[in-house]
Amino acid sequence: MKLILLGAPGAGKGTQAQFICQKFGIPQISTGDMLRAAVKAGTPLGLEAKKVMDAGGLVSDDIIIGLVKERIAQADCANGFLFDGFPRTIPQAEAMKAAGVNLDFVVEIDVPDSAIVERMSGRRVHVASGRTYHVKFNPPKVAGKDDETGEDLIQRADDNEETVLKRLAVYHEQTEVLVGYYSNMAASGDKTAPTYVKIPGVGSVDGIRDAIFRALGA
């Protein structure tokens, strides 16, 4: 089972990725983890990536694709893998295809922007313990206070509405085009095309999980 999960920040990809990886016995692979592991191991690609990062640059798609090929050749990928946050752009998707990295499924978790803003801007955190709340979906017993300690809850900078809207704008501009790329590829009759699946991401976590499993034939 080789697949990628697409969806805006806050769509619930992280939660669903864990369910999928447990169900199919596959690793979740993120470019960040790959880069850190390669740099730590001192591989040729890792050293190349480190040079770029130390200079404050963006690691090229060529290096990323090289790392992907190295990573998926490892033993834990024998049954497949789930790409998290990769590919992000059409050039990356095309480079991956050219490198012979084929996928079985592309799963898009589709959540309206308004629901994502509500989800993320309503989050509140107790910094010391890491306990999280939501003003609507999981409110503390006393507004703005941690249930255990009574200490103040905060809204992380990442979760304020303005920041969420900016991140959504970047997603729509850069990554959402992949939705069209993969759905067109699937419709074109290309034999290497992955099956493209769109799952509504509003509802219970378990309901969304079950819909994804059905789509993946599990």
UniProtKB/Swiss-Prot annotation:
It catalyses: AMP + ATP = 2 ADP. It is found in: Cytoplasm. One of its GO terms (biological process) is AMP salvage. InterPro entries: Adenyl_kin_sub, Adenylat/UMP-CMP_kin, Adenylat_kinase_CS, Adenylate_kinase_lid-dom, P-loop_NTPase. GO terms for molecular function: adenylate kinase activity; ATP binding. Pathway: Purine metabolism; AMP biosynthesis via salvage pathway; AMP from ADP: step 1/1. Its EC number is 2.7.4.3. Residues 122-159 are annotated as: LID. GO terms for cellular component: cytoplasm. ATP binds at G10, A11, G12, K13, G14, T15, R123, T132, Y133, G203. It is an enzyme of class 2 (transferase). Keywords: ATP-binding, Cytoplasm, Kinase, Nucleotide biosynthesis, Nucleotide-binding, Transferase. AMP binds at T31, R36, G57, L58, V59, G85, F86, P87, R88, Q92, R156, R167. Residues 30-59 are annotated as: NMP. Monomer. Catalyzes the reversible transfer of the terminal phosphate group between ATP and AMP. Plays an important role in cellular energy homeostasis and in adenine nucleotide metabolism. Belongs to the adenylate kinase family. Consists of three domains, a large central CORE domain and two small peripheral domains, NMPbind and LID, which undergo movements during catalysis. The LID domain closes over the site of phosphoryl transfer upon ATP binding. Assembling and dissambling the active center during each catalytic cycle provides an effective means to prevent ATP hydrolysis. This is Adenylate kinase. It comes from Laribacter hongkongensis (strain HLHK9). The lineage of its organism: Bacteria, Pseudomonadati, Pseudomonadota, Betaproteobacteria, Neisseriales.
